[in-house]
Each structure stands twice: as structure tokens, then as C-alpha cells.
Amino acid sequence: MNKLKREEKMKAKISNRRFSPLYGSSKRGFTVIEVLIGSSIMLAIVVATLSLYTKSNKVSVDQQQFADIQHNVRAAMYFLSRDIKSIGAGLPLQFSHAFLEGDNNDNSGGPPVYPDKLTFLGNSDPLRLIIQSFDPGSNTVTFEPNQFDMYPYTATSYPADTLGYINRLIIVFPNPELNVQKGEVGKITSVNFVTNQIVFDRVNGKVPKDLNLNPGGDPDDYIGGTVTFIELKTYWLDVDGSYPGGHVGVDGYLGEPGVMYVSQWNPISDSYEHMALALNIEDLQFQYHGDMDADQQLDDNNSDATIDVNDFLNWGDSGDKNFNWNDDEVPAGIRSVRFLILGKTANPYIGFSGSPSDAVKYIYGKPAIADSPAHDEADKHRRFLLESTAQIRNLSLSIYNSGTN
């Protein structure tokens, strides 16, 4: 009996319980407005995240572009500075007028930029053979006895053998004591260690720059003169990728705009071989300073009693002293070369919107450099300009063991 009563009480309790919300509820769900508000908040968070990522990505792309032109300009500066310091190294100082020649505002590439060019001679491999006789008809040079014994070079071909004489570019200088401003540029075709002779082919007319060498002259003027190896280099900028005489894929020419090259004369192919030093270069300018009137004092070219950057001249400028650049003493007196390299990003800055103001035109437009004018239009390409001055400090450097040059 008691057991039945307990069971009835349990059933009564169970029947009086409310169902769990899992099975049914009188509470209402989210309204449409609440759903829209929640979705809007979530969308705003997503959009803000994407906007932050996009902005960060644009900054990263722009920074990468700028870092790239910085690297290019600095690399070009390094090679150019090194070579300028070595102009005329190992060559007779009496012929220093022929060691470098500039082109101011070379217009071969066309507007809107007219960059400068610089061609110069140097000699990194020691060779100075004293001439006993010279036969211009056969281009045969006979040297004093035992001249070949002083150097490690062989009768093989260069560059297959880095110590070979054959195919090397040489310059034949007359006796420096005669003050005869002549010279012959050629490549060695044969060498005879028994007769102390070399034979060469002239390349005077093939070398793009005559460098005031004035080939020819009396054969007797060359007795006591010298024969040395030379390197003939030109630094230049291809503005538009269609430089006259350039053929894409030939001799290293890329055919792309804004490429700075160093070109070296190859006597084997009788042509310049081009090495691209830097991409995305907009302008290249050279200026010169020294004792160009041979008065044993640095020239105050703007007559302000101060020697500074304002005294540098563009190639061919007369300055306050009315220099005549056809006079040998003018190029011979150059002791410093100032060079300016302007880099330009390959693409406009994607993180920059609107039009650049006048205050930042020098950043997003081409500035004036030396005598190269500025551009009025700001094209949103970022610029990077480096300027340096190199002293031609190795001009009288002796690279031989037999005394001074």
C-alpha cells in the first residue's frame, strides 16, 4: 500500500514539471534589426582588417621599390668612383691630356633627359716597354734589350690566357721628353721574344673617342717612348632603350630605358662590350675641377675667393677664365670629377593618392642636376639622388718596380 502511494506521488510531481527549453520555450529569437547590426559590426571589422592589410602592402611595395633604386645608385657610385680614381694610372704623366674626355648633355638618347658621358684611359696591368725603334709602315715596334724579361706575360692569346700578349689593347707613346703630343692605339697581333718586337693593328679610327691622341708623327719621335697596356672605358646612360648603334642582346646591350652602363673596348671584336651597372637610372651628370690653366693653383672658376662645389665646370664650359677645352692643358689639369646619379622608381608610388604638391615636387618629379633642368610634371615616381666627388689620385702612380713613370 505504501509503495503504491509513493509511486502516485512521483507521477504527480513529474506531471507538474515544466518542459525544458530544449523542447519548447516561450522566449522570442533575434529580430531582423539585431541581425543586421551584428552583421554590420562584423563587416566593419573585416573591412578594417582588409584596409589595414592593403595599406601595409602598399607601403611594403613602395619601400621595396625605393630600396631597389637605392641599391642600384649606390652600386653605380661605387664602380664609378673606383675607376675615376684610377684614371691614368701607370701611364706617362706627360700625356695626361689624353686620359679622359667628357660629353656634356649627350642627346643621342633623345629628350626629356640629356645625360653626360665620360670616357677615360687606365692601366691596371703593369707594362712599360721602352721603344728602340718604330716602323709605322708595318706597325712593328722594337724594344730595348731584355724588356720582355721584366714582365710575366707570354706569347699566347688574351683573354684565354690572362697573361697573354696577343689581342691586348696597347698605346704607343712617343718620347715624353720631346713634348710631342702623339700616340697610337692598337691591339697586339704577334710578339717575338728573340727580336724584342711586337706587331700591332691600329684601332685609332675604330675607338669611339680619339682622346686627343693625334696618331702618327715622325718615327724617330717614338725612340725612347713606351708601350703600355690600356683599358678604355665609358660610363653612360641609356635614357630610352634605343641608343644609336645599340642592338638588343649584342655586346651586352639590354635595350631597356634607364640603364646605366660601363662599356669597355674589346680589341678582339673591335667594339664596345657593355655591362649594365644599374637599372632605373633617370639622369647621370659629370662636372670637373682642377688646375686647368696650369698656374699651379686650383681654379676659382666663379671668382668668389672660395674653392667649393660651385667651381666645378661642365665639360666645355669656359668659366670665368674662358677656358678653351681644345687646349691640352685644360683636360690635363683636371684633378677632381664630381658625378651625380639620379635613380627613379620603376613604377609610381601606389601608396600616394592625389597630385603631389609643389613642396614635394623634387621627390616625385625630376629635380635640376648640374646643368640638367628640372621637370615641371610630378609623375609620382620617387627619386633618389646621390652625389660624390672623386679625386684622380692615381694619375702619377707608378705601378712598376723601376722607378717613377
Predicted regions located by residue number:
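Short secondary-structure boundary/capping segments
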Residues: 2, 11, 60, 135-137, ...
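N-terminal leader/signal peptides at the extreme start of proteins
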Residues: 1-30
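Short, solvent-exposed loop/turn and secondary-structure capping segments
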Residues: 55, 132-133, 350-352
